[in-house]
Amino acid sequence: MENQARLIRLPEVMKKTGFGKAWIYRLISQNRLPQPVKIGIRATAFVESEIDEWIQLIIENSRKHVA
């Protein structure tokens, strides 16, 4: 069975990252956060696995610089 990507909306990304909406949009504009996908005329969502991988990468990089 194929692993299907789960799409999450901005409020869930905010909960997962702890960042506010403006900061998330800033990171997106700087290509520092995975880009959202268009799911409608005025709606976007994020691929949950991409956000989770990004969070893990941030954690790993943070711990590398502490040591």
Predicted regions and their residues:
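Extended, folded domain segments that form the structural surfaces/walls around functional sites
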Residues: 47-49, 65
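Major-groove DNA-recognition helix of helix-turn-helix-type DNA-binding domains
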Residues: 17-45
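Polyanion-binding surface elements
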Residues: 1-23, 50-60
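C-terminal secondary-structure termini that scaffold catalytic or DNA-interacting sites
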Residues: 60-67
